[in-house]
Regions:
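Conserved catalytic cores of phosphodiester-cleaving nucleases, focusing on short active-site segments
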Residues: 61-63, 68-76
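Short acidic/glycine-enriched loop/turn segments that link adjacent beta-strands
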Residues: 54-57
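Metal-dependent nuclease catalytic core centered on acidic motifs
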Residues: 1-48, 77-158
Length: 158
């Protein structure tokens, strides 16, 4: 991933200090991508927006933090509809998912959706959530814990 970010086509997005792109600022998803990227920068990441080629399932971002590079597919949660469907549809795009929660989504349902995602996708590594100024990272190990629902809801609902 480091080599991808060093590709000469990445330039700073106009008006930003830690968000890079290879173009596509006028893509229909750009505002949602930029919103999530701003939150990632607030949490200490440098963000690289990846191109979105037609007919090809790819991740949306590479985050760099303290020398580590991670690739994420963005799913923005606008309403109270099923996050589970969005998570399952992301299988094959990236092994890390970023859920940008912009609505009041039930913590119990969200925990169940995340657990089901890890069960359905053996390659899944992490589901990262942004909810307001809060960030919650859930890995496979945590989702398999018998205490997962209680621990997740405590973090999510506080």
């Amino acid at each position: 991933m480091e080599k991808i970010t060093q590709y000469g086509g990445f330039t700073l997005v106009k008006g930003e200090t830690a968000i890079y792109s290879v173009g596509g600022e006028y893509d229909g998803d750009f505002d949602a991508l930029l919103d999530a990227a701003h939150k990632a920068v607030e949490h200490g990441n440098t963000v690289y927006l990846l191109p979105n080629p037609r007919n090809c399932r790819t991740a949306d971002f590479i985050f760099r933090k303290k020398g580590a590079y991670m690739m994420y597919d963005l799913k923005t949660v606008y309403g109270k509809g099923s996050v589970g469907t969005q998570l399952l549809n992301s299988i094959g795009q990236s092994n890390r998912i970023l859920l940008n929660i912009t609505s009041d989504y039930n913590g119990r349902l969200l925990a169940a959706d995340i657990k089901a995602y890890f069960e359905a996708n053996r390659n899944a590594v992490e589901v990262l959530l942004f909810k307001g100024k809060k960030t919650i990272s859930v890995n496979r190990y945590a989702a398999q814990s018998p205490m997962f629902y209680r621990q997740f809801r405590k973090k999510y609902e506080q």
